[in-house]
Curated annotation (Swiss-Prot):
Homodimer. One of its GO terms (molecular function) is methylenetetrahydrofolate dehydrogenase (NADP+) activity. Keywords: Amino-acid biosynthesis, Histidine biosynthesis, Hydrolase, Methionine biosynthesis, Multifunctional enzyme, NADP, One-carbon metabolism, Oxidoreductase, Purine biosynthesis. Pfam families: THF_DHG_CYH, THF_DHG_CYH_C. HAMAP family: THF_DHG_CYH. It catalyses: (6R)-5,10-methylene-5,6,7,8-tetrahydrofolate + NADP(+) = (6R)-5,10-methenyltetrahydrofolate + NADPH; (6R)-5,10-methenyltetrahydrofolate + H2O = (6R)-10-formyltetrahydrofolate + H(+). NADP(+) binds at residues 165-167, 190. Belongs to the tetrahydrofolate dehydrogenase/cyclohydrolase family. This is Bifunctional protein FolD. It comes from Cupriavidus metallidurans (strain ATCC 43123 / DSM 2839 / NBRC 102507 / CH34). One of its GO terms (cellular component) is cytosol.
Length: 285
């Protein structure tokens, strides 16, 4: 029997509709939520991501400011622009699209964003606050994954969860959110010895390591929930995740597809973070 599909597009549509209503109420009160997106260089994938984020804002009643710069923009000029956005009352969230050109220190740039406008949740103030369970913002991708688990009413308390991938953007915050939900969490990576020894006992697997087919049917517990965060290309050039979808869907209880799974939820939670920033500033959060 095939696994139940957790449809990221459908869930994102539902959450965005609710966000649009909240945004309309804010706008009517003179506080339209605003997101500034900063893109440096001409990376094709980054251009697609930025375009999707700006469109999501426009489609749901948010103000968006797209700041495009050539790849040779100096670090000092980028920091100066971020300072301007920090002080712009129309902007409630600032997103700097990664990766940045090599001559720019991405850590320094992310730390320059005011924590109350750090809607990606990457600033050390928010990353640290996540440890205590009280961040201003949760990183968008793991936040979206948690919403997907919530949508199937999965009982995380006491569940065994394995996160494959330990990045600051997904793996580490994902593990922290699962811990806070009461799960027993193991973090693995691409170099973990005997990955199967960990995943075969997992009730929930989150694959976020960026390696195609690292999760196969033979290492998944029957009935497990499998969340695929990976973004790769198969031999035909088609988008695929870290999970062997065709095989694993015959074993798992629930599974997310790629595309149409975590991706739409990531942008949706960016809207939610921006909305909450605007509500806080308006004094109604």
């Amino acid at each position: 029997m095939s696994a139940h599909l957790i449809d990221g597009n459908a869930l994102a549509k539902q959450i965005r509709a609710e966000a649009a209503q909240r945004a309309a109420r804010l706008t009517a009160a003179g506080h339209q939520p605003g997101l500034a997106v900063v893109l440096v260089g001409e990376d094709p994938a980054s251009q697609v991501y930025v375009r999707n984020k700006v469109k999501a804002c426009e489609d749901n009643g948010f103000y968006s400011s797209l700041n495009r710069y050539p790849a040779d923009l100096s670090e000092a000029d980028l920091l100066a622009r971020i300072d301007e956005l920090n002080n712009d009352p129309k902007i409630h969230g600032i997103l700097v699209q990664l990766p940045l050109p090599k001559h720019i220190d991405s850590h320094k740039v992310l730390e320059a964003i005011a924590p109350e406008k750090d809607v990606d949740g990457f600033h050390v103030a928010n990353a640290g606050a996540l440890m205590t369970g009280a961040p201003l913002f949760r990183p968008c991708t793991p936040y979206g994954c948690m919403k997907m688990l919530e949508s199937i009413q999965y009982p995380l308390r006491g569940a065994r969860a394995v996160v494959v991938g330990a990045s600051n953007i997904v793996g580490k915050p994902m593990a922290m959110m699962l811990l806070q939900a009461g799960a027993t969490v193991t973090i693995c990576n691409s170099k973990t010895r005997d990955l199967a020894a960990h995943t075969r006992d997992a009730d929930v697997i989150v694959a976020a390591v960026g390696r195609r087919n690292i999760i196969t049917a033979d290492i998944v517990k029957p009935g497990a929930v499998v969340i695929d965060v990976g973004m790769n290309r198969d031999d035909a050039g088609k988008l695929c995740g870290d999970v062997d979808f065709a095989g694993v869907r015959e074993v798992a209880g629930h599974i997310t597809p790629v595309p149409g799974g975590v991706g739409p939820m990531t942008i949706t939670m960016l809207l939610i973070n921006t909305l909450e920033a605007a509500e806080r500033e308006a004094g109604i959060a």
